[in-house]
């Protein structure tokens, strides 16, 4: 059985435990161990996850396969007609099983529920991440690129991709 459920503050440890596996797996060949550690704390400490959900309006959804958490997606309203797909990750053992696509589709569904009119979903993705082709297959287009400082002398070297909804 497969389901996607909206996360609450009670689910922070689930998100963090998934991130502890998927984030290093995704970026181990792209980022230094030091930058990985910095970014894990910056994005996934309990304090920062709580801030994202309460103060910044992130909506997290967790995918479950046979009752076990296997991935998550986070979207955030960003302006009047734009939403940012902040995070979408699936456990390595479940990649290739269409869970990422289903999480992506869930993000679009939620955005349409919040904003029934035309809008855009954007995301940042590391230029060296194989996920670029995943997003392109789902209809996203590169709209910009940049090197964005995130603190401690680190940068995110990203494409910004967009999809009209």
Spell out what each predicted region is.
Residues 2, 6-12, 17-87, 91-93, ...:
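Acetyl-CoA-dependent GNAT
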Residues 68, 91-105, 118, 126-133, ...:
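Conserved glycine-rich acetyl-CoA-binding loop
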């Amino acid at each position: 059985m497969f389901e996607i459920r909206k996360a609450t503050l009670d689910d922070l440890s689930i998100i963090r435990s998934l991130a502890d596996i998927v984030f290093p797996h995704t970026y181990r060949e792209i980022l230094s161990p030091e930058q990985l550690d910095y970014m894990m704390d910056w994005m996934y400490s309990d304090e920062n996850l709580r801030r994202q959900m309460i103060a910044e309006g992130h909506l997290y959804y967790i995918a479950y396969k046979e009752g076990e958490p296997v991935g998550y997606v986070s979207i955030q309203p960003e302006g009047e007609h734009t939403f940012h797909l902040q995070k979408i990750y699936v456990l390595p053992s479940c990649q290739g099983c269409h869970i990422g696509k289903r999480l992506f589709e869930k993000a679009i569904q939620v955005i349409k529920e919040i904003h029934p009119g035309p809008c855009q979903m954007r995301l940042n993705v590391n230029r060296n991440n194989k996920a670029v082709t995943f997003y392109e297959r789902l209809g996203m287009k590169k709209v910009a690129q940049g090197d964005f400082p995130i603190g401690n002398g680190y940068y995110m070297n990203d494409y910004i991709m967009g999809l009209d909804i």
